Protein backbone atom coordinates (compact mmCIF):
# COMPACT_ATOMS: atom_id res chain seq x y z
CA UNK A 1 0.00 0.00 0.00
CA UNK A 2 2.74 2.60 0.77
CA UNK A 3 4.18 2.01 -2.73
CA UNK A 4 0.86 3.08 -4.30
CA UNK A 5 0.37 6.14 -2.06
CA UNK A 6 2.97 8.58 -3.49
CA UNK A 7 1.73 8.49 -7.14
CA UNK A 8 -1.89 8.97 -6.01
CA UNK A 9 -0.81 11.89 -3.84
CA UNK A 10 1.13 13.37 -6.74
CA UNK A 11 -1.78 13.01 -9.15
CA UNK A 12 -4.08 14.57 -6.55
CA UNK A 13 -1.69 17.50 -6.17
CA UNK A 14 -1.44 17.84 -9.93
CA UNK A 15 -5.22 17.87 -10.26
CA UNK A 16 -5.50 20.57 -7.58
CA UNK A 17 -2.80 22.62 -9.31
CA UNK A 18 -4.50 22.22 -12.68
CA UNK A 19 -7.86 23.20 -11.16
CA UNK A 20 -6.30 26.29 -9.57
CA UNK A 21 -4.63 27.30 -12.85
CA UNK A 22 -7.85 26.84 -14.83
CA UNK A 23 -9.94 28.80 -12.31
CA UNK A 24 -7.35 31.59 -12.22
CA UNK A 25 -7.20 31.70 -16.03
CA UNK A 26 -11.01 31.81 -16.33
CA UNK A 27 -11.24 34.47 -13.61
CA UNK A 28 -8.63 36.65 -15.37
CA UNK A 29 -10.41 36.30 -18.74
CA UNK A 30 -13.78 37.12 -17.17
CA UNK A 31 -12.47 40.17 -15.32
CA UNK A 32 -10.70 41.46 -18.45
CA UNK A 33 -13.77 40.98 -20.66
CA UNK A 34 -16.03 42.49 -17.98
CA UNK A 35 -13.81 45.55 -17.59
CA UNK A 36 -13.49 46.10 -21.34
CA UNK A 37 -17.23 45.58 -21.93
CA UNK A 38 -18.11 47.99 -19.11
CA UNK A 39 -15.65 50.54 -20.46
CA UNK A 40 -17.02 50.21 -23.99
CA UNK A 41 -20.61 50.45 -22.76
CA UNK A 42 -19.79 53.57 -20.73
CA UNK A 43 -18.06 55.15 -23.74
CA UNK A 44 -20.93 54.33 -26.08
CA UNK A 45 -23.51 55.55 -23.58
CA UNK A 46 -21.61 58.80 -23.00
CA UNK A 47 -21.16 59.49 -26.72
CA UNK A 48 -24.81 58.60 -27.41
CA UNK A 49 -26.05 60.93 -24.67
CA UNK A 50 -23.79 63.71 -25.93
CA UNK A 51 -24.98 63.17 -29.51
CA UNK A 52 -28.68 63.18 -28.55
CA UNK A 53 -28.15 66.23 -26.33
CA UNK A 54 -26.35 68.14 -29.11
CA UNK A 55 -29.04 67.26 -31.63
CA UNK A 56 -31.87 68.15 -29.28
CA UNK A 57 -30.43 71.68 -28.95
Curated annotation (Swiss-Prot):
The chain crosses the membrane at residues 9-29. It is found in: Virion membrane; Host cell membrane. The keyword Methyltransferase does not apply. The keyword Membrane applies. Residues 1-8 are virion surface. Keywords: Host cell membrane, Host membrane, Host-virus interaction, Inhibition of host NF-kappa-B by virus, Membrane, Transmembrane, Transmembrane helix, Virion. Residues 30-57 are intravirion. GO terms for biological process: symbiont-mediated suppression of host NF-kappaB cascade. It is a single-pass membrane protein. It comes from the Viruses. Signal peptide: none annotated. InterPro entries: SH (IPR001477). GO terms for cellular component: host cell plasma membrane; membrane; virion membrane. Interacts with host TNFRSF1A, RIPK1 and IRAK1; these interactions interfere with host NF-kappa-B activation at the level of receptor complexes. Interacts with host protein UBQLN4. Belongs to the rubulavirus small hydrophobic protein family. Plays a role in the inhibition of the host NF-kappa-B pathway. This inhibition occurs at the receptor level, by preventing the signaling of TNFR1 as well as IL-1R and TLR3. This is Small hydrophobic protein. It comes from Mumps virus (strain RW) (MuV). The lineage of its organism: Viruses, Riboviria, Orthornavirae, Negarnaviricota, Haploviricotina.
Amino acid sequence: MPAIQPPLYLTFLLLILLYRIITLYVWIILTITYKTSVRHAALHQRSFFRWSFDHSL
